[in-house]
Design a protein with these regions (language model features):
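Generic alpha-helix signal with a bias toward terminal, lower-confidence helices
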Residues: 29, 94, 162, 200-202, ...
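Extended serine/threonine-enriched, polar tracts that run as long, contiguous segments within proteins
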Residues: 132-210
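Short peripheral tails and domain-boundary helices/loops at the edges of structured domains
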Residues: 208-246
């Protein structure tokens, strides 16, 4: 039997890869990409359940997970680039496919057709419910900054409002006086904290400002992402397990 000998070599030169840059991905559009969600894991998150198909080794309540790479964090540094609030329409568990029935803009009249049920869900006449969802598109800092989305709902809406107030409250001195810089001018630290009310306890977000962006290349990445989101070129693919496991 003929055998083909394979010569062992070291790593290929980056120059070789650069000569073929982007080849093989010419037909990949934004529609074919998954925007990572950053969420806080809770007791009911499938990632912490060792018998679940979505279990992630090392995952535990109170950790942050990147839903695309499954990387786990105790805290993260992010640059917020764009904010968008929406009402996401869901079916109840057991009936849902795991994807939203529809996504309604924040100024939609559909909200006026809902009634609050005993579980504090805003029910539509068709039996589905709406979830007020605050979407924060961010740059996740690290060795290789990446785009991501943090969605806040239920009790985390208060955290989102606080974060928005922090961003709007920043003032800088310019040649024409004080001005409010773009949200992507500053870096924030987000970490999970335990929260509670008369219904129970859960993990939510805590947000703290670190300071201004000092690297122009990072600033340019954040600005470009903000512009793409603003033009509608980046769409979040919400799923029932992409947001925080916040039961209240």
């Amino acid at each position: 039997m003929n055998q083909v000998a394979t010569k062992k070599e070291g790593a290929l030169s980056a120059n070789l890869f650069e000569a073929d840059a982007n080849k093989g991905s010419q037909n990949i559009s934004q529609e074919d990409l998954a925007l990572p969600f950053l969420k806080v894991l809770g007791q009911l998150s499938p990632e912490v359940n060792k018998t679940h198909g979505k279990y992630v080794e090392g995952a535990e309540p109170g950790k942050i997970i990147n839903t695309v790479t499954n990387e786990l964090y105790s805290n993260i540094n992010v640059i917020p680039v764009f904010y968008k609030r929406q009402y996401i329409e869901w079916q109840d568990r057991g009936q849902s496919t795991g994807a939203p029935v529809a996504i309604h803009e924040a100024d939609s009249d559909i909200v006026s057709t809902t009634t609050r049920d005993k579980s504090y869900k805003d029910r539509l006449p068709n039996g589905n419910y709406l979830e007020n969802t605050a979407n924060h598109f961010v740059i996740l800092m690290g060795d290789s900054p990446t785009t991501a989305l943090i969605s806040m709902k239920a009790t985390q809406i208060k955290v989102s409002r606080k974060w928005n107030s922090m961003m709007r409250g920043i003032k800088m001195q310019g040649k024409n006086g004080l001005f409010t810089p773009p949200t992507y001018s500053h870096i924030y630290n987000l970490k999970p904290v335990q929260m509670s009310n008369d219904k129970g306890t859960w993990f939510g977000w805590d947000v703290a400002k670190i300071g201004p962006v000092t690297d122009k290349s990072i600033y340019d990445i954040a600005k470009n992402f903000a512009e793409r989101v603003g033009k509608g070129e980046v769409q979040a693919k919400h799923g029932s397990e992409e947001t925080n496991s916040t039961p209240y």
